Amino acid sequence: MPETALWEHRSTQTEPDDFDAFWAATLDETRAHPLDVRVEAVDTGLTTVDVYDVTFAGWAGQPVRAWLRVPAGATGPLPAVVQYVGYGGGRGAPTENLFWSATGHAHLQMDTRGQGSGWSRGDTPDPDGSGPAHPGVMTRGIDSRETYYFRRVFADAVRAVEAARSLEVVDPARVSVVGGSQGGGIALAVAGLVPDLAAVAAYVPFLCDFRRASVITDADPYKEIGRYLAVHRHRASSVHEVLSYFDGVNFARRGSAPAVFTTALMDPICPPSTVFGAFHAYGGPKDITIWPYNGHEGGGPEDDLLALAAFRRASA
């Protein structure tokens, strides 16, 4: 789709009548378990950043791991950034990803349950099983909205914000969320579920406009859905009904915090039209940066600088 058409494009993604009720019940069920935040200092050898191994209770009270990185010796209260990672990745090593702590933020990087063996390592299992699924997580538990994998992930992600806000070093009124690709999609879900974030940044976000994405790109991970439906031909309608409860377009409609989006015109993994579908639907103040000559890497470090500027404005 040409860039000029993207500005006119609107997603046709519909939302279930009980979308809000489903997510309210999901979060009520999740919050029935104590948050149980545990923080343990990690000896990394770093001199400018203090790192902590954090565990909190996510979906069903199941433990979720995260790294907390803060400027060395900081006592706060600091503005905080909760970060979600891309598909197949985990929280990585404690000495990685130092940008946000270097900018004076408390930085909580959430592990993604059941991932963390594709390009960075993770430490959080997904104890819940599922029925038949295509390799990967896109169709795990897709038989119903209750069992779908991303129900658990999005519940974890909301609890990550709550865990960050519980920390003495964090100013709970100045918590922003950020992520790229899958992490960007998770950030948009949190933006729709947590009404009082300071700001949101979604770089080349995944998990947006599933129905469109699943038919316009041959690239994984969206293609996992296509391969599943190539085998389960009769299930297209029910699968897309389930996915509508997890679509970034529907979460974006409920977002209210200032948001920064980015997209890349040569991105085959998260096609620009799917990103624009979420961008145009977003309910709060918003801006989008287009990288005309990039693929799924988007703006790389430039995306971080865009987010930093937005977060500082929101936390001033």
Model-derived segments and spans:
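N-terminal targeting or regulatory segments adjacent to alpha/beta-hydrolase or S9 domains
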Residues: 1-50, 103
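Short beta-strand element of the alpha/beta-hydrolase
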Residues: 66-70, 76-88, 107
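Cap/lid segment of the alpha/beta-hydrolase catalytic domain
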Residues: 92, 98-99, 105-155
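Gly/Ser-rich "nucleophile elbow"/oxyanion-hole loop immediately N-terminal to the catalytic nucleophile
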Residues: 136-180
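Hydrolase active-site cap/lid region
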Residues: 188-234, 290
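Short beta-strand/loop motif that positions the catalytic acidic residue
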Residues: 255, 261-263, 267
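Acidic catalytic loop of the alpha/beta-hydrolase fold
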Residues: 265-270, 297
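Histidine-bearing beta->alpha loop at or near hydrolase active sites
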Residues: 285-305
